[in-house]
Amino acid sequence: MHFLIPAAGSGSRMKAGKNKLLIDLEGESLIYWTLKSVFSASSTNWVGIIGQPKDKNLLLNSTKDFAHKVHWINGGDTRQQSVFNGLKALPKDAEKVLIHDGARCLINPELIDLCAKQLDENEAVILATKVTDTIKIVDNEGFIKETPDRNYLWAAQTPQGFLVDRLKKAHKMAIDKNWNVTDDASLFEMLNWKVKIIEGTYSNIKITSPIDLKIAKLFVKNP
């Protein structure tokens, strides 16, 4: 399985003053923990890290023994552009790809393998968890408009897996139509292409704030 990891997080909400994937988690960088999980998955055979050139040396150095196993890909101005750069950098024989947020460093390798396996039967899959909170849709003035049925609500995670040719086509169409999305599954939705949900775990959090880092430390100490 080919694997792409967007790794351009600025760390502004973490107040880190550097790429957040360089932040320490129990003695190792976040990107190190992410790669440890990715390479622990039996389906992984090629990994590309997509980041900004200024971060290249620091990120690769922080991955330690994994540095010689990954391929560096220069990112774009947005996550969407960066993923498209990653798709163009894949080996010509790549048929399937998993895309995973670099800041989701607690991903279970077995879930990675499950996503890879599900691509044998689906052209697009994503990890997600059932929403347990009551969600409110509000208007521009902050008043509640409606409460959607949470039985139909899922919180999207990564990895998100796709057939490479299909995802490339979706990205090219997004460029032509000037679409801007926050994840790749959204492109498939806009094109009315099916995306299969695979139930993930609540531990697969994205590190975006100091409280997330504290939670991640608990999971690392108590796997």
Swiss-Prot record:
Enzyme class, broadest EC rank: transferase
Domain of life: Bacteria
GO molecular function annotations of the record: 2-C-methyl-D-erythritol 4-phosphate cytidylyltransferase activity
Site annotation Transition state stabilizer: residues: R13, K20
Site features described as Positions MEP for the nucleophilic attack, chain residue numbers: R150, K206
Keywords of this entry: Isoprene biosynthesis, Nucleotidyltransferase, Transferase
Record EC number: 2.7.7.60
Catalytic activity: 2-C-methyl-D-erythritol 4-phosphate + CTP + H(+) = 4-CDP-2-C-methyl-D-erythritol + diphosphate
Pathway: Isoprenoid biosynthesis; isopentenyl diphosphate biosynthesis via DXP pathway; isopentenyl diphosphate from 1-deoxy-D-xylulose 5-phosphate: step 2/6
CDD domains linked to this entry: CDP-ME_synthetase (cd02516)
HAMAP family linked to this entry: IspD
PANTHER family with a match to the protein in the record: 2-C-METHYL-D-ERYTHRITOL 4-PHOSPHATE CYTIDYLYLTRANSFERASE, CHLOROPLASTIC
Role summary: Catalyzes the formation of 4-diphosphocytidyl-2-C-methyl-D-erythritol from CTP and 2-C-methyl-D-erythritol 4-phosphate (MEP).
Family membership noted in the UniProt record: Belongs to the IspD/TarI cytidylyltransferase family. IspD subfamily.
Protein name: 2-C-methyl-D-erythritol 4-phosphate cytidylyltransferase
Organism: Prochlorococcus marinus (strain MIT 9301)
Gene: ispD
